[in-house]
Amino acid sequence: MILCPVPSEQIDRAWKDGASCLSEACETSGGEITGDQLKMILSRGERTLLCMREDDKTVGWAVVRVDQLPNLRSLHVTDLVAHNAGFERFFDALKNMAQHLGCSRVRCSCKEAQARLYRMKLGFKPVYTTLEVELP
């Protein structure tokens, strides 16, 4: 089980090789971002695409960014699609990546079902909840 960062100049190829499934994750963002917009952000190097591989097969895709905040540096998983791949099996590799990038935290954006799973299996804890109301 390894995480392979995809260079920004290889995003188009990765998209054709299956990373386009990240559009599914974008659909749960409440209109914040589309799959095409995510591809553009990745191509510009603003976030990093990770290929999740096991036994020489791609089993999932994730997108991360480093957030340098005033009191901490965090690796934030913004998008993830790994159908039945067990993302938690890749978590040690993700923590190692975060440490090598100088991060002291790993954060993720997710829905309630994933939040429960990540709390139980990976030790995540809620930091805050973001709510919104649409204006006319």
Stretch-by-stretch model annotation:
Residues L50-M52, V106, L131:
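Hydrophobic beta-strand residues in large extracellular and virion-surface proteins
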Residues L72-L122:
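Acyl-donor binding region in acyl/amide transferases
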